[in-house]
Regions:
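Catalytic glycan-binding domains that act on GlcNAc-containing polysaccharides
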Residues: 33-203
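Hydrophobic membrane-insertion alpha-helices, especially the h-region
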Residues: 18-36
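N-terminal Lys/Arg-rich, disordered targeting/topogenic segments
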Residues: 1-16
Length: 203
């Protein structure tokens, strides 16, 4: 009788272990499927378009690839023909005035319509960020703020100890639109970095 009870208990224990293993396996499959589904959705929303151009100009001008992807995603959503109410043009939403200034650095003489060309737009975004990162000591947050608000405005903020105690980085950004823009770009950069870590050149 005692042996029969022990045998029955043993069978129940084995059965419970089997059920636990099955449940764990099913949970793992569901979690994995959910992860890949979410990753696929994010990759559709944050694609690696213009990869050859971005890789080329990121390396040429010393700019992280994920930063260029994040900027393009935020600025135009990869719309080559985008034009803002302020007159910013193309994938990277560079204004004609900024384009003229950047061309004094490259020695080119292109019309503003050239910014509708993807290659030109990506190149000059990389040129601009290369200059901004150099000017602001490699600090991406400050460079992103300058891309949006302008170098003059950011330099004025850096001279304010309440905004920049060290005079080099922005502890806070007083202009709400620029603050939101910086946060949006940084979020996009972070997502690109997580989704495509192996493919991206960080510089």
């Amino acid at each position: 009788m005692g042996k029969a009870i022990k045998t029955e208990k043993g069978r129940r224990a084995i059965g419970a272990v089997k059920i636990t293993v099955i449940v764990v396996c099913l949970a793992t499959v569901i979690i994995s499927a959910t992860f890949f589904a979410v990753k696929s959705i994010l990759k559709a929303e944050f694609p690696m378009k213009y990869q050859d151009k971005i890789s080329l100009y990121a390396e040429t001008y010393g700019v992280p690839e994920d930063l260029l992807y994040g900027v393009i995603h935020t600025e135009s959503g990869y719309d080559e023909k985008a034009k803002s109410h302020a007159g910013a043009i193309g994938l990277t939403q560079i204004t004609p005035e900024t384009f003229l200034w950047l061309q004094t650095k490259t020695g080119e003489n292109l019309p503003e319509e050239a910014l509708y060309d993807a290659d030109t737009s990506v190149k000059y975004c990389a040129v601009f960020y290369g200059l901004l990162l150099k000017e602001f000591g490699g600090d991406e947050k400050t460079a992103i703020a300058a891309y949006h608000a302008g170098r003059g405005q950011v330099n004025a903020w850096l001279r304010d100890p309440d905004i920049s105690p060290d005079g080099k980085t922005l502890v806070n950004i007083p202009e709400s639109e620029t603050k939101k823009y910086v946060e949006k770009v940084q979020r996009a950069v972070s997502i690109y970095d997580k989704l495509y870590k192996k493919e991206l050149n960080k510089i």
